[in-house]
Structures are given as C-alpha cells and as structure tokens.
Swiss-Prot record:
The gene is surE. Signal peptide: none annotated. Pfam families: SurE. This is 5'-nucleotidase SurE. SUPFAM superfamilies: SurE-like (SSF64167). It is found in: Cytoplasm. One of its GO terms (molecular function) is nucleotide binding. InterPro entries: SurE, SurE-like_Pase/nucleotidase, SurE-like_sf.
Length: 250
C-alpha cells in the first residue's frame, strides 16, 4: 500500500521513525509531519500564514517532508500537493502518551486521522501509553497486522481507528479489545506566576486523570494491559436530541 505517515510530535520524534521502519519493508511510505511539536493542537489548520515544506534526512538518508503547520495541515497538503494519486491509507503516530477518553478531541495525532477520514481515506491514529516509552515492540508487531486487516476489510466512510498500546513489551500484552471512547478526562491545574515586570502569567501543570470504570472503554482496556482499538468519526451530532430540540418551539 501507499501510506502517508504523519504525527503531532514532529518529524524528528522517535515514534514516527519507529513506525516508518516497521512499515517501509512492506509498504510505500511517505512521511509528511510537522516541523515542530504540535501536541494538543486538535484539528487546527493554518489559515493566515503560508505553509512551507522542506526535506528531512535522518541517519544520512532522506526520511520525508517537514511542514510548518499542524497535523491536519500535513494530511491536507500531502493529499493535495505531495502525493499523486492520494495515499491508500493514512497512519498517524506513534504518539507519545495515550489518546483516550475526552482527550481525543485535543489530540493532533487523532485529528490527522480524522482529517483523512473526512477526505475519504482509511486511517488510524496510534499512541503508546507513555511520554517516555521504553519498548515499541507491541506497536511494531500489531500495527502492520492491523493495516493488513483494514486493507482487506475496509472501513465505513468517515470512520477511522484510534489505537492505544500499553507501554509494555509485546509478550506482556494481554490481547486486543475493541472499545468505545470513554469519558476519562484531565483535570487541569494552573501555576500562577508573575514576570519581572509584574504581569501575571500561567503554566498548565499538575494535571490529574478522572478515569473510567467501564470495561468497554478505551482507557480501562489500556489500564488493564490490552491494546485498545476504537472506531471514531467526525460527526458530532447528538441524534437523540434532534427530536427533543424540535419540540422546543425554537
């Protein structure tokens, strides 16, 4: 397959290099990733500034393209300008840190995959449950297998897969769970400081997790050492509320 590989940790991140090496022997892989880290930018796109693309070499060899934009920008520019015909599949990751629960909406990694789904391209986002992972073997074993299955079975229009992998060696993974997006979220705290000129500013710090207790959710499957695979889509409509709103005499 022709695969577009992107991420939100940036083109020089360990995770994207790991996925590239895991996929390159079996697939034609094109890397288009942000030049700088774009964690938690969500589905933002660049509107008021130009986008610049530059070649990137790693370990003395051409690796891919760095873009001065967001993960969603990377997918858009790759499909519109850098890959012809469009890719057969878009893979976003490996993200450092899980993307589960409500935090999915903040994720640039997941947003790259949902952007591809909006464009009608099968896609998946891949994250590992650590900001400093020590072993990618579970990722490099599972993702190529999942790609083969998706290529065979297909995905419904507008749907992508959100994959979260425990920070464990492959032989310690308990299995794979198909899950729903949970309600786990971060409870943010801000550190209030004062600069030398007396102006107040804030650092986001000391975030705590409100975890799910439903075994069908992505976060709990991950916490129990299972790989979590969640089908997600960009349609945010709450369909059950449509009839109710219609009775409000708006």
């Amino acid at each position: 397959m022709r695969i577009l590989l992107t991420n939100d940790d940036g083109v020089y991140a360990k995770g994207i290099e790991t996925l590239y090496l895991a996929l390159i022997e079996e697939h034609d892989v094109t890397v288009v990733a942000p030049e700088t880290e774009q964690s938690a930018v969500g589905h933002a796109i660049t509107w008021l500034d130009p986008l610049r693309v530059k070649p990137v070499h790693r370990n003395g060899h051409f690796f891919g393209h760095a873009l001065t934009g967001t993960p969603a920008d990377c997918v858009k520019i790759a499909v519109a300008e850098l890959m012809s015909p469009p890719p057969d599949m878009v893979v976003s990751g490996v993200n450092m840190g899980a993307n589960v629960g409500v935090n999915v909406i903040y994720s640039g990694t997941v947003s790259a995959a949902t952007e591809a789904a909006v464009m009608g391209i099968p896609s998946m986002a891949v994250s590992i449950d650590s900001f400093q992972p020590t072993d990618f073997s579970a990722v490099t074993e599972f993702v190529p297998r999942l790609l083969r299955i998706v290529a065979k079975e297909g995905l419904p229009p507008g749907v992508c897969l959100n994959v979260n992998v425990p920070n464990l060696p492959a032989d310690r993974i308990r299995g794979v769970k198909v899950t729903r997006q949970g309600h786990m979220k971060m409870v943010e705290r801000y550190d209030r400081r004062i600069d030398p000129r007396g102006h107040v500013y804030y650092w986001l710090t000391n975030s705590a997790l409100l975890r799910d207790d439903d075994p069908a959710t992505d976060s709990l499957a991950l916490a129990r050492d299972y790989i979590s695979v969640t089908p997600i889509h960009h349609d945010l409509t709450h369909y059950e509320m449509i009839d109710t709103l219609g009775k409000w005499n708006l």
